[in-house]
From Swiss-Prot:
Annotated keywords: Centromere, Chromosome, DNA-binding, Nucleosome core, Nucleus, Ubl conjugation
Encoding gene per record: CSE4
The record's account of how the chain is modified after translation: Ubiquitinated. Is degraded through ubiquitin-mediated proteolysis when not protected by its association to the kinetochore.
Entry keyword Ubl conjugation: yes
Primary location group: nucleus
Function per UniProt: Histone H3-like nucleosomal protein that is specifically found in centromeric nucleosomes. Replaces conventional H3 in the nucleosome core of centromeric chromatin that serves as an assembly site for the inner kinetochore. Required for recruitment and assembly of kinetochore proteins, mitotic progression and chromosome segregation. May serve as an epigenetic mark that propagates centromere identity through replication and cell division.
Molecular function via GO: centromeric DNA binding; protein heterodimerization activity; structural constituent of chromatin
Name used for this protein in its record: Histone H3-like centromeric protein CSE4
The organism of origin for this protein: Yarrowia lipolytica (strain CLIB 122 / E 150) (Yeast)
GO CC terms of this entry: 2-micrometer circle DNA; CENP-A containing nucleosome; kinetochore; nucleus; peroxisome
Keyword rRNA-binding: no
Length: 150
């Protein structure tokens, strides 16, 4: 059985469009001209970041800022709950000054930041970039009973 090859001027298959169909090479639609309406069926894709770029951007943002990262109301609820459990029900109607709660939150966040710095150093010492539970345990064990305070 012999095969017959038909040579034609178009190299595409009949019925299938050639090319990108009017799309930008990166998958974006072309810009609309003034007075021209955009076709709502075509989707404009956002530019994709390389893996790890968004994480690095987030790290830089948090290192630059000084704002509190834990929400204030949930933190205040936890503080009140711990105080109630520690002191007992006879002190059930304790009132807290907002500055006292703010000072506790500042101290708690500073403690956590310092702890995670130590945990990161433990992970780097183990030739890893990912922190693990064993890094947290080692950092807390090295810090001692008071967690590096005092």
């Amino acid at each position: 059985m012999a095969r017959i090859s038909l040579a034609s001027s178009s190299a595409g298959v009949a019925g299938k469009p050639r090319g990108g169909g009017g799309l930008h090479p990166l998958g974006q639609t072309r810009k609309t001209l003034p007075g021209e309406r955009r076709d709502t069926t075509q989707k404009i894709t956002k530019p994709r970041y390389k893996p790890g770029q968004k994480a690095l951007k987030e790290i830089r943002r948090y290192q630059r800022g000084t704002e509190l990262l834990i929400a204030k109301l949930p933190f205040a609820r936890v503080v009140r709950e711990v105080a109630l459990n520690y002191l007992g029900s006879e002190y059930g109607n304790l009132q807290w000054q907002s500055m006292a709660l703010l000072a506790l939150q500042e101290a708690a966040e500073a403690f956590l930041v310092h702890l995670f710095e130590d945990v990161n150093l433990c992970a780097i010492h183990a030739k890893r970039v990912t922190i693990m539970q064993k890094d947290m345990q080692l950092a807390r064990r090295i810090r001692g009973a008071w967690g590096g305070a005092g």
